[in-house]
Amino acid sequence: MEKKLKITLVKSVIGQSERQKATVKSLGLRKLNQTVIKADTPEIRGMINKVSHLLKVEEI
């Protein structure tokens, strides 16, 4: 079974760089406290590392 990650946006993207806003959007997050479930891949992990200060991540 493939590992999954539960990713929640816990801090606003207002005041962040355009690059960080684009990364959050590419993760599928738009609103504060919105949660998405993504596969645990190196690509997703890289995006999470770039904006880790805005996210809460849990392994499922």
From Swiss-Prot:
One of its GO terms (molecular function) is structural constituent of ribosome. GO terms for biological process: translation. Keywords: Ribonucleoprotein, Ribosomal protein. One of its GO terms (cellular component) is cytosolic large ribosomal subunit. It holds the Pfam family Ribosomal_L30. HAMAP family: Ribosomal_uL30_B (MF_01371_B). Belongs to the universal ribosomal protein uL30 family. Part of the 50S ribosomal subunit. This is Large ribosomal subunit protein uL30. It comes from Carboxydothermus hydrogenoformans (strain ATCC BAA-161 / DSM 6008 / Z-2901). The lineage of its organism: Bacteria, Bacillati, Bacillota, Clostridia, Thermoanaerobacterales.
